[in-house]
Amino acid sequence: MKKGRLYLEMRDYIEANYSDATLNVNALSEHFERPAPFVSRYFKEMNGTNLTQYIHKVRLEHVKEKLLQDEKLETIAVTCGFGSLRSFLRIFKQYEGVTPTQYRELHGKKEETTNENI
């Protein structure tokens, strides 16, 4: 398997499985039958981004689409692969600079009910 091909397969696998909360370097290591340190180092060499950061970015792209719909934050967090609402809120703010509710307000939708101060 060529290196470029393995990278593309990893990207495709992440995109297809972003909603799985257990998706991480160990899951990719197991799926592609490669040691976790290799998977982590190889992905960063090919993409320029840490694997965990890349998974977060893929998930957040899906989150941003869902925020423009009427889904509750708790539902979005679970369906986009975050293990908890708390981690979802922390990661979203870390990457986007605003809370999910603020993002929604800036982009035209308002959250019905949620507590972001968890």
Which stretches of residues belong to each language-model region?
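…primarily DNA-binding HTH/wHTH and HhH modules…
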Residues: 2, 90-118
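A generic alpha-helix signature
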Residues: 1-5, 9, 34, 58
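Terminal helix-turn-helix DNA-binding modules in bacterial transcription factors
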Residues: 12, 45-83, 106-118
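Basic, amphipathic alpha-helical hairpins
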Residues: 2, 9-23, 43, 47, ...
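Basic/polar phosphate-binding segments, predominantly the helix-turn-helix DNA-binding elements
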Residues: 26-54, 77-102
